[in-house]
Amino acid sequence: MLKQLLYLCFILNALSAFSYKEDSTLSQLKIIEGKINPKSIAHSGNGLFFAQNMMYKHTVTVYNRNFQLLKTISDKVELNKYGYSRRKGLYRGSPVECTFTHNGRYAWVSNYNMSGGSETEFSKPGCDNCHGTGIYDSSFVYKINTSTLLIEAIVKVGAVPKYLAATPDSKYVLVTNWSSSDLSVIDTEKLKEIKRIKLGTYPRGIIVDSTGTKAYVTIMGSSKIAVIDLRTFEKTWIKDIGRSPRHLCMSPKNDYLYVSLNGDGVVGKIDLSTNEVMKVKTGSLPRSMALSRDGRHLYVVNYGSDTLTKVTTLDMKVVDNIKTNDKPIGVTYDDETNNIWVACYEGSIMVFHDSYYDSTVKDSLYYELLAQNAQEIDFRKKLPLKDKRPMLESEIEKPVDILPDKIIGNKVNEYYLIAGSFKNKLNAEKLVKELSIKGHNSFIYFNLDNQFTYACVSSCSSKSMAIEKSNALKEGGISVWLYSVR
């Protein structure tokens, strides 16, 4: 028994030389500028990115994965053409946030407030410091067809609508009304508000669990989160989580809630079985967040410190911090490209690439080691860590399949176009195979310095040629970055 315990301890220690380490791999990919002041950025799930430009530009700008502007949608509407017969003339909105329904077919955009019409219309607009039921003008949510990029319907909600979230079945769109201190429930088939739920001062962020039965709403003027049963519309509370909770994300298994606490400058992880909160400092005034599809990484924009922070959700540790343009306020994640889009309020959208890819193949090294005979490994010798690797590799039948020790690919050229970087070579091989099926002459390059295996789309002898190829690949929908071996 003692030998078995000693062997297990040795295995766990030895694996530290081989085991996966969280990689800090954020890099800036693109800056989009123009006539924009984005308050938020949202991904449709199908390669469209909607930026909401508030009353400063009165537009929604729509981009594709190649960073091309597809359309600038004006917030100018004729309300009488959308069922509001008493509203004559032209009106303007002020796009704030966006969510999607029906697998990305429709975008729903909130408008901070409305203007236009007669002098008596919209004469009591809400504001950031305004709150109270029945005092301020109601506003509207636009429904936009993502195929035509046209406004198809308009739904009246509360005062200063901000965040929106849809149920998984696309039956409801929920909207927080900042100044009227409540939540609107929109029936997407009836195209009208069917319920108004009183919440408290400054409701903001919303997340709906994957079952579609519960919605969580932050009350930014408090330290509480409302929990709403979407079958009965009754509410309960998670209390004392921290000051000014703003944005929410939820783990894939619905067991943890992530919240940005704007007043405390931290991000919290709430265990929903106990309501205990684990917190991490990310930067000044953390605002919006995005969660990777596997739930391992949280991306946080810090409005006061102009940074994008990457956090591992397992232990709530900061693993990367990268500078952004002024006032980052919105963020969205594209799990097809591993790109993070950041809305910077002062007038730009920044796109960052995270070269971390989730392992889809279990590391067989662990199982190979467990299969070995403990007595054959002399763990009594005090060897430096770098000397343990050859000893362990001698016990494994196929070490090259797990830890390649040579460069595979074209060693003559100096510039490589990288589509992905991996700790596990098998994952790199998987991506190379996928690229080859698409007609690319892809190959693997192993970097001895950082122990990453790169999936390369191409290699070039000059930087100018590499940039030209990179641009051509991006036009074809493949994001790459350049790696120089000089």
What are these regions (language model features)?
Residues 4-13:
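Sec-dependent N-terminal signal peptides
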Residues 16-397:
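Predominantly soluble domains enriched in secretory-pathway, periplasmic, or organellar proteins
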Residues 350, 413-416:
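Short structural boundary motif marking the start of a folded domain
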Residues 36, 55-57, 93, 136-139, 391-413, 423-486, ...:
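Extracytoplasmic
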